[in-house]
Amino acid sequence: MRNSKITWSIVAGVALALIAGVGVAIAVSRRSSGPAAAPVTSSSAAPLVSITPSASPAPSPGADIKGPLDLVLIGVDTRVSIPDWEPHADTIMLLHVEADLKSAYLYSLPRDLRVDIPAYRKSGFGGGKHKITEAMSRGSRIPGSDKKSVEQGYELLTRALSAYTGIKTFQGGAILNFGGLDKLVDQLGGIDMKIDQKVKSRHRKPDGSMRTLSGGDYIGPQATYQPGVRRLVGWQAIDYARQRYGLPNGDYDRQRHQRQMVEAILAKALTQGLSDPTRLRPVIDALGTSLVYVGGRTPFEYAYALRDLTPDKITTVDLPGEGVGSGGGYLGEQLKDEGRGFIKAIAKGNHRQYLAGHPKLVDK
């Protein structure tokens, strides 16, 4: 299998906090086919509303959210230190929440996945077949301006996702940059991750400082993550989930590690009672402008709606893929038939039956 040629920075992101569940729900309602709503950063979240019953109890915020839900979790590489750098969706995770809002399926798409990206008038993009990460960058352009709009990029990305997956509407989405995830993990006091293979960092020294870039590569001592359950602080969690070089399956191993990180964040959030909005508020506020969510719902509404979605009820799914090229040149990635089959099954609502017939897709 040819490894994806991608660079990482998250999330998301994962969006990787791009987490929707157990109160760290930062995906906010919007329609993928509609106009982008005004962006909201975590520091400007809606006023906190108590969910404690009163003498005349009103419906809890988020009580009207109904399943099933399809949420987009995006980790963005902004490279703000580089002039004219355009945002790239370096991590793309999709979370399908069942109708009862008590179980879900988490899966990743390669950022180099080759797809048809629709035309987008706001940025002047005429459409074409590209790596899906380019939907974020091409959509972010503002004609006549040097500025970039992450929110526009998100809108075009979700349109491309809808076209590829057949999922007509994504009810929520969130964008988190590299620094935001670092802050999130540290706000939680670190996370416990089960490291499934030895991983050497390309970017960090054992003390967390950056390795020296020389001649197009990094030199110096490397941080190393040994198999086993390890307590990781923010920079370690991000660094571990960032690595793809030297791994047997390259980016596909990295995608699995990122999903594992999301599960670890959810597990830690559960132990800290972050389904309680009063405890969730400081965590979200600490992310500041690192977190952007789009639309009219707040993280606190999703925190209530998904209060029963615990980590053990989230099935992580591995979608195998392979590189595609032309004339010896690399063009991107494509999912293998069984991976595409799962995507189609999600859109049709028969994913449980599909996984029963393809049990190897379920991460162990």
Over which residues does each language-model region extend?
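Non-catalytic, solvent-exposed segments at the cell envelope interface
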Residues: R2-A12, A20-K364
